[in-house]
């Protein structure tokens, strides 16, 4: 690991949380790794912000890009463990830490994920000590091998706009899973390092998810999300259950760049 250069990348809305900053100040650097340089991109469109940060990582010749969202609370050894997993396998392009959705319902990682039908995805099985092969991890805490990005054509981070018509609700999502799919298509691997347990801070409730960490008996089997009476929960994977029907329509987004 000696001589590895790592860029810390933060895509922020402009108001980083206090728990994020406190944890960042306690982050341990792996042996032989120079002090972290930082690239912070402020805005309200995460894919473009990640694009700016990746441009910095490529232009400045970093070995790894360490994405951390400004509402994620890292354990002190997060970077040490993620780098250990990445260095053990040069074919691993992305290693993600474990964190949950703010409602504590699900870990942010997917198996059997496909960009043309996201309803095929489920939550992969993992244990507290595993570095499991998965299809995608959240980039709230993720270490990316920069050399694998060089095999892709920019822009590096496409995105989905998820439209819930009955609820009249729209959200941007999946730039992390789509990047993972792109590098997997190039023959690389994506791993979830469940040793890295990150809290996901909610500004509104001033609390962190998960409310309670699941044990191996719960996480050691593949699971799927079901919606019942307005709430969601995880249940063991059952491929016979009908999936939500999706329709996909492409809409152009043009990046206009100025100096």
Please provide the spans of the model-predicted regions.
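C-terminal catalytic/acceptor-binding lobe
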Residues: 155-247, 251-258
């Amino acid at each position: 690991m000696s001589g590895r250069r790592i860029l810390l990348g933060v895509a922020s809305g402009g108001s980083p949380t206090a728990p994020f900053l406190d944890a960042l100040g306690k982050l341990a650097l792996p042996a032989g790794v120079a002090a972290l340089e930082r690239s912070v991109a402020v805005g309200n469109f995460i894919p473009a912000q990640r694009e700016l940060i990746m441009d910095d990582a490529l232009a400045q010749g970093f070995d790894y890009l360490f994405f951390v969202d400004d509402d994620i609370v890292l354990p002190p050894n997060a970077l040490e463990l993620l780098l250990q997993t990445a260095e053990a396998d040069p074919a691993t392009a992305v290693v993600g830490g474990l964190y949950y959705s703010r409602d504590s319902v699900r870990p942010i990682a997917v198996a059997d994920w496909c960009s043309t039908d996201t309803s095929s995805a489920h939550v992969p099985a993992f244990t507290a000590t595993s570095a499991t092969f998965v299809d995608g991890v959240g980039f709230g805490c993720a270490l990316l091998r920069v050399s694998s990005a060089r095999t892709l054509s920019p822009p590096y981070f496409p995105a989905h706009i998820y439209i819930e018509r009955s609820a009249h609700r729209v959200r941007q999502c999946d730039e992390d899973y789509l990047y993972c799919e792109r590098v997997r298509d190039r023959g690389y691997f994506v791993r979830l390092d469940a040793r890295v347990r990150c809290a996901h801070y909610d500004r509104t409730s001033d609390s962190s998810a998960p409310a309670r960490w699941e044990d191996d008996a719960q996480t050691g089997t593949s699971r799927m999300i079901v919606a019942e009476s307005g709430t969601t929960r995880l249940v063991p994977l059952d491929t016979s259950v009908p999936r939500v029907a999706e329709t996909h329509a492409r809409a152009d987004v043009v990046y206009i760049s100025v100096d």
